[in-house]
Amino acid sequence: MDASYQPEQIEAQAQRYWDEQQSFAAREEREGEKFYCLSMFPYPSGRLHMGHVRNYTIGDVISRYQRMQGRNVLQPMGWDAFGLPAENAAMKHGVPPARWTRENIETMRGQLQRLGFAYDWDREFATCDPEYYRWEQWLFTRLYKKGLVYKKTATVNWDPVDQTVLANEQVVDGRGWRSGAVVERRDIPQWFLRITDYADELLEALDELPGWPEQVRAMQRNWIGRSEGVELDFAVAGHSDTLRVYTTRPDTLYGVTYVGLAPEHPLAAEAAEGNPEMQRFIEDCRKGGVAEADIATMEKRGMDTGLKAVHPLTGEQVPIWVANFVLMEYGHGAVMAVPAHDQRDWEFASKYGLDIRPVVHPSAEERADVSEGAFTDDGVLADSGEFSGLPSAEARQAIGEKLEGLGKGERTVNYRLRDWGISRQRYWGAPIPMIQCPACGDVPVPDEDLPVVLPEDVDVTGGGSPLKDLPAFYQTTCPQCGGEARRETDTFDTFMESSWYYARFACADQKGAMLDERADQWLPVDQYIGGIEHAILHLLYARFFHKLMRDEGLLQSDEPFRNLLTQGMVIAETYYRERGDGGKDWYNPAEVTVQRDERGRPVSAVLEDDGEPVVMGAIEKMSKSKNNGVDPQALIDRYGADTVRLYTMFAAPPDQSLEWSDSAVEGAYRFLRRYYGLVRDHVAAGPVPALDVASLDDAARDLRRKVHETIAKASDDVGRRYTFNTAIAAVMELCNALGKAAANEPSGAARAVLQEGLEAATLILAPIAPHVTHVCWQALGHDEAVIDARWPAVDESALTRDTIELVVQVNGKLRSRLQLPADADKAAAEAAALADEKVQRFTEGKTVRKVIVVPGKLVNIVAN
């Protein structure tokens, strides 16, 4: 071994060995139970950030641990390569998106390899590869023929900056999730996948995913939003039209005081004819998005149409209002408004002076107070005709039956979930494989013409997709009639590619099919790792896509991911100065000097360049916008990959936020250097005799017990609890104990325990710091590489103790500690405690009233 810890040399040596041996190539025929570990693949933005490093280190530690358990492990890596940033970069730098993307992939692949992740690189692909997205196009045409794909003109969220449609999930606080632009409503022809056909299965199967965080399952349940209610019809006075509405609260039907219409509703358009004020209001409503969360928080506005709706049970006429909070895409574009029992309706009615009529009360004796807000709980009906006096639950059933009997409504199930709009008016995405023929309509591209290849040598200038200006791309002939036709110029939502990539990794080299029998061998993924921000986007779409592929006969399993780990964010301090224009200039923590008080708490900060103060902001997620990121490459260059890996696993449990600390990174480096030195000095001391447990003295026996206690703890922490930080802490404690023992120049028998302890520490650290342990394992005398070694086993006999330590308290205060035989009973413990000199100093002259013995732990003496 080298005299000093040289990370760069050690890591190059280990990686060279893994490459030569093809250590991480997954083989279907290999013995052992399969284990498929997958971290969400990255968008090739150009460089790894610390969030990537944390995510992929967690996955790599789990993969390497499972390999040490004898399992046949698959851990692949690829690239989620389509998306808007490539187009933005093309406009900014004049580089085609394809070239920008592939150059970034080269850079990031090198960074991942430098970190020593155990990926099977033979399975690598990028979603922008035509041989990948051809199968996505192929499946789309199958779904079209099944009726699971359809096209309709829909009111959509339009991002005016990115010039594309956004799914509701991609609108955050009324703004586009990438551009930050205020979203508008537009009517655009769109392609949709019928995810609602799978709503019940997607909902019910959540109960079969106990390995998922309950928070994620709850988010999906809420997003799917199954509800049981009634669809009912309000006639329009003086019109042949009826308005169909859906309600989960038919028990409040007698409290309806107005009906709300979506601005896009045909009746609203009719009311606006010859009414410029109404036309302006409807146009103004279209400036907001159609995301439900944003509708809920915006100011409620409306206009009276002058039309009246006829109550289906009482015949009462109530006003019809156009309201900006009613969505055409939800229900039927109309809502029955019950201000007394719905807070949104109450706010609207209060603003415009509409009636508020309570018809449900907390009890028969207690009236609902709706002067300050709606009463939204269940209760007892009043002023509701024949249904007065019924509890809400009974009234819902009875009123539903009444409406059905009159032919004015029906009980039904509804969902918040909408069909998935997958059309995007962008260039850098997979082309939608449809052809528009004047004679035949929409026609899918035949299998023999797939893939529809995205032309890569184009100029991206903004203002929408360049495909619509490329006759060479869109001019084609109809597959059915042979006439002139036009190719679809929209591309798939990029969530399409990430909805099935995990399955393609099982058979990435398959040229003749989307998937083959290897998909059933590897799927479902045993451990999936990624951020909770994907709970209702990627994770729901992937579950849906898995069921589509199953029903196409491509695989047999029902769910894609057996277990899900949602890792916490990497967070760091932020510093800024206010600009004159109200904006902020953000400074990287490395540019700032922080002054701290005597307890180490930050009190002020100055910029190193000029010595002037900066404002200490919140501790936030590392981001470019806040300039509080740390470059992983700089850390690797300075400390080595193993230090970066060790720090990310030690700083916090994987599901919690990791607060960045430069000093803790330095501490991780010092520990690895100390561990390396322990092995080096031990090896330099010469040959080690075989372990003879019978010949060990008490000190060696205690050290051996520490070794096996550490193995037991680490096995549980890494294998079951995923609390890698506590496993690392246990190894650090063990190394401290080994270092103390080594300093005492141990005998031959004790050196055998040192050998056993260093081997155990090496094996436990191997998944976390694989490079230095590769070198140390060989130095400890092993012919096989540590990558092929098994996880250490606990010797239960080593855990037994001849003596135990008991804490002795007098009146609840610690007064002494006793060493007793491990088999000492309560009486012996009590007698020893009362006879102890230290204890007697506190019981002398007092009467012992009670002695409480907790076996193996403590004795508490009550005396006064």
Swiss-Prot record:
Catalyzed chemical reaction(s): tRNA(Leu) + L-leucine + ATP = L-leucyl-tRNA(Leu) + AMP + diphosphate
Keyword Cytoplasm among UniProt keywords: yes
Entries under Pfam families matching the protein: Anticodon_1, tRNA-synt_1, tRNA-synt_1_2, tRNA-synt_1g
Subcellular location(s) of the protein: Cytoplasm
GO biological-process terms attached to the record: leucyl-tRNA aminoacylation
Classification via PANTHER family: LEUCINE--TRNA LIGASE, MITOCHONDRIAL (PTHR43740:SF2), LEUCYL-TRNA SYNTHETASE (PTHR43740)
Protein name (Swiss-Prot/TrEMBL): Leucine--tRNA ligase
Organism: Alkalilimnicola ehrlichii (strain ATCC BAA-1101 / DSM 17681 / MLHE-1)
